[in-house]
């Protein structure tokens, strides 16, 4: 992976505009497209209430070719019936037509409030004047335009060989992806073998976006896409996978630390599991525990809540509490040792000091085998409750 300052990938253009989805008049409509043919890899939500955007995208990426995506923020267009499906098709078709592309090469993604129709009159008015954007780049504008309750845009750039990879993402709530993420779009001018591109993309997504959880709620609109137009030539697949992992992990940490009302990033490192799947399961159980989340928020060195959360994995009968080790940062808190009152006070003080940081690391060694997985989340605050209790009001 190159250390040079990454630039914009060749051949990608961005258009953003306000079309009435957002109440504050900000840009809420985004088109990201490649001027050259591109291969595409994508993963989507497994929600049984998936929106029409997800359904249309699944169909479009089946042949591994796509040139772009239109993103509508502040309206999920989910649970909107036949009208919502027809509106999604109309928007996608109109964008493709404006750019002179086959409809099947344009994807569509939506995010925001569920159960509301698109404001089609204002969208149609904007689509009448849509054309290819002038000049390459604009990913920073796209990262901002796709936001909903995010407090900041999320963008990352990485150089790999002679190519550039850019990633943007949104999402801070309703976030526990299942083979997808919230909305994440990667664009690269690297040339990749389509089959290998798909394999490495799925591997990276599983280790990054599928490892983050804010509130255990899986979105109906989760979509992650990688476009590769090849204008920079071939790159080593292994190097590209490393670059993609670096970019995706940076976005994951940014999402987790920007969780609705969040003040702290929580990283749970599970080792010594029977396999990686067990490690992931234990890590998710810990990072999703409201008691663990609130303890982290309050800097309360109540490490027993982590032990409680591990114990909830009752189907994992090979977990033996006498073999488990728990630590906060570098401070080992379990198994218990005969320390004396002063030593116990010092231990709690050391844990509390670690919890006062912006990033909290909880380490768990199950001492069963060599399975390992790291998951990411955030603390639970009054801000989360306030924001979600007033979301549509």
UniProtKB/Swiss-Prot annotation:
It catalyses: N(2)-acetyl-L-ornithine + L-glutamate = N-acetyl-L-glutamate + L-ornithine. Changing residue 148 to A: No autoproteolysis. Substrate binds at residues 148-149, 170-173, 181, 260, 388, 393. Optimum pH is between 7.5-8. NCBIfam families: ArgJ, PRK05388.1. Catalyzes the biosynthesis of ornithine by transacetylation between N(2)-acetylornithine and glutamate. It can also use L-arginine, L-glutamine and L-lysine as acetyl acceptors. The role of this protein is probably directed towards producing increased intracellular concentrations of arginine for clavam biosynthesis, rather than primary metabolism. This is Glutamate N-acetyltransferase Oat2. It comes from Streptomyces clavuligerus. The lineage of its organism: Bacteria, Bacillati, Actinomycetota, Actinomycetes, Kitasatosporales. The gene is oat2.
């Amino acid at each position: 992976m190159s250390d040079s300052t990454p630039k914009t990938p060749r051949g990608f253009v961005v258009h953003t505009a306000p079309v009435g989805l957002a109440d504050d008049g900000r840009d809420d409509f985004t088109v990201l497209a490649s001027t050259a043919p591109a291969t595409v890899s994508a993963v989507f939500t497994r929600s049984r209430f998936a929106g029409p955007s997800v359904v249309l995208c699944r169909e479009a990426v089946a042949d591994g070719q796509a040139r772009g995506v239109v993103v509508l923020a502040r309206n999920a267009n989910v649970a909107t019936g036949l009208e919502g499906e027809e509106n999604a098709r109309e928007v996608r078709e109109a964008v493709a037509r404006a750019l002179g592309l086959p409809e099947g090469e344009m994807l569509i993604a939506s995010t925001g409030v569920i159960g509301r129709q698109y404001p089609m009159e204002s969208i149609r008015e904007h689509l009448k004047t849509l054309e290819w954007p002038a000049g390459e780049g604009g990913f920073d504008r796209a990262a901002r335009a796709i936001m909903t309750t995010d407090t900041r845009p999320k963008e990352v750039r990485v150089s790999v060989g002679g190519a550039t990879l850019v990633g943007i993402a949104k999402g801070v709530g309703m976030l526990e992806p299942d083979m997808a993420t919230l909305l994440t779009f990667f664009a690269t001018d690297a040339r990749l073998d389509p089959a290998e591109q798909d394999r490495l993309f799925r591997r990276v997504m599983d280790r990054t976006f599928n490892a983050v959880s804010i509130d255990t709620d899986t979105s109906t609109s989760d979509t992650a896409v990688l476009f590769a137009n090849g204008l920079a030539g071939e790159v080593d697949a292994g190097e590209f996978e490393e670059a993609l992992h670096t970019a995706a992990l940076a976005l994951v940490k940014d999402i987790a630390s920007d969780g609705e009302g969040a003040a702290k990033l929580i990283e749970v490192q599970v080792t010594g599991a029977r396999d990686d799947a067990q490690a992931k399961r234990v890590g998710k159980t810990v990072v999703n525990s409201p008691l663990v989340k609130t303890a982290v928020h309050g800097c309360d060195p109540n490490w027993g809540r982590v032990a409680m959360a591990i114990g909830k994995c009752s189907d994992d009968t090979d977990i033996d509490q006498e073999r488990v080790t728990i630590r906060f940062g570098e401070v080992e808190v379990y198994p218990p040792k005969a320390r004396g009152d002063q030593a116990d006070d010092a231990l709690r003080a050391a844990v509390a000091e670690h919890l006062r940081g912006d990033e909290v690391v909880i380490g768990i060694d199950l001492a069963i085998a060599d399975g390992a997985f790291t998951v990411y989340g955030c603390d639970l605050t009054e801000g989360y409750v306030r924001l979600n209790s007033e979301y549509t009001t």
